[in-house]
A protein has these predicted regions:
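Accessory RNA-recognition modules of RNA-modification enzymes
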Residues: 1-176
Length: 176
């Protein structure tokens, strides 16, 4: 059942960085919405698609990646550093508590950009036989070609180009 243009008040951020609001049948999860925002969303069951931000969170910042919201790798790039760190710390605290562990959590090291040391690049050949390399689009199997990723650690900066070159060599040799 799709409800077009539902007005929602986002209550909190979920574990995957999506905005969460309680609906009549449980939680509704809206990617790219932040806690405290009033949004307009298309709702289908427990999923929402952000259509418009009616009232933005004061914690909202501009995304620093040109692929944000296209590539499926980043969920909370629009959240300012201090609330981002608080959200990440609360995720860790909840996980430890759930496991029955008590531990003091040290402040996070700022890696809200340029800190990712691992990435999975996907590749396939297109209908012309050329390699298409990049990250998967959010909630799909479509590959989004990228030239760079500002979240990668400096030592990983050349990884997209290297992955693309390797995929092209494999495609040229007939490997799939």
């Amino acid at each position: 059942m799709i409800s077009l243009n539902a007005r929602l008040q986002i209550e909190r951020l979920g574990q995957r960085g999506e905005g969460v609001v309680r609906g009549p049948d449980g939680g509704i999860f809206v990617p790219y919405a932040l806690a405290g925002e009033t949004i307009i969303a298309e709702v289908d069951g427990s999923r929402g698609k952000l259509v418009e931000i009616a009232v933005a969170s004061p914690d909202r910042i501009a995304p620093f990646c040109r692929y944000f919201s296209i590539c499926g790798g980043c969920a909370v790039q629009t959240l300012a550093q201090a609330p981002y760190a608080h959200w990440k710390e609360s995720l860790l605290a909840e996980a430890l508590q759930h496991a029955g562990l008590a531990a003091k959590i040290a402040p996070l090291i700022d890696a809200h950009g340029e800190g990712r040391r691992r990435a999975t690049f996907h590749a396939r050949t297109d209908e012309t036989g050329n390699a298409v390399t990049g990250f998967m689009e959010a909630r799909s199997h479509k590959i989004i070609e990228i030239e760079d990723c500002p979240l990668l650690a400096p030592s990983m900066r050349e990884a997209p180009a290297i992955a693309g070159a390797l995929a092209q060599v494999l495609a040229s040799s007939g490997s799939r």
